[in-house]
Amino acid sequence: MIPDDEPKDWKGEANQQIEKLRKSDAEIAIKGIKSFKDADNLQLLVSQTSHNFAFGTAVDCQRISDCFESGYDDEYCSFAKMNYNMLVCGYRMKIKYVEMKKDEHNYKAGDNTVAWAEMNNMKVRGHSLLWAKAENNPSWYRNLYGEEFVNAVYDRIDSAVSRYDGKIPQWDVINEMIDQGYENHTFYLDHSGDSNIRTKIFQRSKALSPGTMLFLNDYGVVDDRSGRFELYQEQIRELLESGTPIDGIGLQVRKT
């Protein structure tokens, strides 16, 4: 996020943050040299085989799942394995897919993707636990109100967060709370009747998996200056002030 009053030397500040957040010092012990003079002309080649800084991409988790089940990594899976250390399912872990039918849960693609990632020393981000756009929820879910709706929300949280506790390091808990008109989506408020429902959702998720980082996520915040930036800040500030355990924020961008 770069505000209107961005610093003139923003690239310089960014490089300072890279030095601070993405890099660390390393010590190399060299044995077999009798004196420091022997090391004057020593040439040392270091090849980095992996890194701790998360660098990932969205993938079609059905294709990853197919690779896992077949035991063969096709070109798609091989490319993901070679270039990234973190994955996020574009669709297959979202509630609309996992819970198409009431009281039925389809975690097959998600489970297989997590297992495939573990085999290849990769991580999977949970995306997304809940979605604030009404139309992106199962039809049966959209017809619930009051206590029945809240129970369905909690069932989704309990099922998904508990299932991947210790396996998924991060969850996008509530996805896209800003609509096309730059106003807050009120799906959870409208259906639950509870003005504090968003905070309760985060609190329940954190209680089930304390070690998992919980995120808000939204799109069009960085490159759209029509009010989404300010509204996102307002949402975050309001939730933090109400005691919502938010560990990070997502800035979703799609580029081709």
Across the structure, where does each feature detected by a protein language model lie?
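N-terminal substrate-binding region of glycoside hydrolase catalytic domains
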Residues: 49-111, 116-123, 128-148, 250
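Active-site-proximal loop/turn and secondary-structure-junction residues that shape catalytic pockets
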Residues: 61-63, 93, 130-132, 175-179, ...
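Active-site cleft segment of glycoside hydrolase catalytic domains centered on the general acid/base Glu
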Residues: 99-109, 136-234
